[in-house]
Every structure is written in C-alpha cells, then in structure tokens.
Amino acid sequence: MGIGFIQDKLEIKFLILYIAARVTEPLAPAEMQDLTMCDDGIDYFDYAECLNDLVKTEHLRLTEDGRYVITEKGLKNSQICESSLPYSVRQRSDKNIAAYNKEALRRAQVQSHVTERDNGTYTVTLALRDDVDELMELRLMVADRATADGLAQRFQQEPEKLYA
C-alpha cells in the first residue's frame, strides 16, 4: 500500500459514506471504486472489505440493479464523521464527486435509445430534457443497427450539434 492520508479501515468507511452522501444517483460498483480510490493509502482489498461491511451494517444498501445507495443510518453517520477525513482527501473527493455529478446530470438530460421494429429497421429516439420537462424528442427510422447505434452515440457525445 502506498503512503497516503487515509490510515485505517475506519477512515476508508468514512470516505465511502462521504462519497455516497454527495452523489446525485446510486453508484455502480466500478463508479464507487473509482471515486473511493483517491488516496494512496487505500488498497483495493481494504476498500472491498469496508464496502461490504457498510452494506452488512446497513449504512449502504444495494439496489435491485446492483448499485450502492446510502441509507438514513449511513447519512447520519456520514454527517457526524466527515470532519474526521483529512482535508486534502475531502478536497480531492469533492472535485471527483462534482465531476461525477456533472456527468450524471448530462446523462439525465441527454438520452438516446435504439429499438428494433417488426420490419427489421430500427427507431432511434433522441431526447433532451431539463430539470422540469422534456425540451425535445426526435424519432428517426434507420435501416441497420450499426447506423442506429452510431447515431445514438454521436447524439450522446454532442447533442448541441443537432439542437443548435
């Protein structure tokens, strides 16, 4: 394990709760790991053990689709213990969480979906939403799956090109 500001498993648990309390949506296992491994003092095996312990003690729970979400108990303990985290770790975590939340907001606002039709063609649905309502929805018929997937992916990457 590298030298870092996180010194023990209790601090890893505090960090996991700190992160879970600040994200805007439940986290997939890989996302939780990416956000937690922000300090050289954390190794994967300690992280995995701490994450499992937090689920067992009902500070976190797993959703039906395998994502982690903080419970009321976890939120309460996170608020009590967050000042125990080293300041530099909190700063780095806040930066990473802000970037994650920004990307999550974009995923919620820019959506695309491909469905196969009965005749073998595909419908690509492209939608833009804001916090309140749907701004735009466009459905396009395309001949093959590759074209449909490409169109959906390009819209996800640069929706402003279509909307402008």
Q: What positions do the PLM features span?
A:
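Acidic, glycine-rich loop-and-strand cores that form catalytic or ligand-binding grooves
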Residues: 88-89
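Accessory beta->alpha helical hairpin/"wing" motif in late/C-terminal subdomains of nucleic-acid enzymes
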Residues: 63-82
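Contiguous, well-ordered alpha-helical segments that form the cores/surfaces of helical PPI scaffolds
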Residues: 14-18, 34, 52
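Short alpha-helical segments that sit at the start of domains
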Residues: 1-25
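Short amphipathic alpha-helical interaction segments
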Residues: 41-56
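A short, conserved structural fragment
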Residues: 55-65
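Short acidic, hydrophobic short linear motifs in intrinsically disordered regions
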Residues: 25-36
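Exposed, interaction-prone assembly regions rather than primary DNA-binding/catalytic cores
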Residues: 92-164
